[in-house]
Design a protein with these regions (language model features):
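Compositionally biased terminal segments of proteins
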Residues: 1-164
């Protein structure tokens, strides 16, 4: 579906529909200066009813479909998005992972006070999970991919601390 990955276009679509979300994962790390590569955009979204309706409108515009084998034509529904689970989607502008919760069942409301507002480009401000919380979550997950990136995230946090 996606011919070119454009995470900024996905974020602009969400902002244009007033979707409440927090950027987590690799894009959150990159926005905070970590020199890492990422292949998808991870968002923890608010599961409040009004927000889910706005999110569904954004996903419709993005032509979002599940990217799991055999489900490539399935679209996310309200009942999918209200769950605490992960929705692994492909959009017109690349892979998007929508997370009801992360870590130890932490959702949008629980994480909001652990975010920073950052400029994502083109006058778009986004809520991003702060680097220390991102590190804590990666330590909890403890899979090979997360363990590999931890030294880079810690070093970035250390460098940011020196610059403050």
């Amino acid at each position: 579906m996606a011919t070119k990955t454009d995470f900024l276009a996905i974020l602009q679509t969400m902002a244009g529909r007033d979707v409440d979300y927090i950027v987590v994962g690799g894009v959150a790390a990159v926005l905070q200066g970590a020199p890492v590569a990422t292949f998808d955009l991870d968002l923890v979204h608010s599961r409040e009813p009004e927000n889910l309706n706005r999110l569904l409108a954004a996903l419709d515009f993005l032509e979002a479909r599940y990217r799991t084998l055999g489900a490539e034509t399935a679209r996310p529904t309200y009942s999918h998005l209200v769950s605490p689970g992960h929705q692994l989607l492909m959009t017109r502008w690349g892979p998007l992972d929508l997370l009801g919760t992360i870590g130890e069942a932490q959702g949008y409301s629980e994480l909001l006070d652990r975010t920073v507002t950052l400029d994502a480009g083109q006058d778009l401000s986004v809520q991003v999970l702060d680097l220390s919380t991102l590190i804590q979550l990666k330590e909890q997950l403890a899979n090979d991919k997360d363990r590999a990136i931890l030294p880079i995230l810690r070093r970035t946090l250390e460098e940011k601390g020196k610059g403050s």
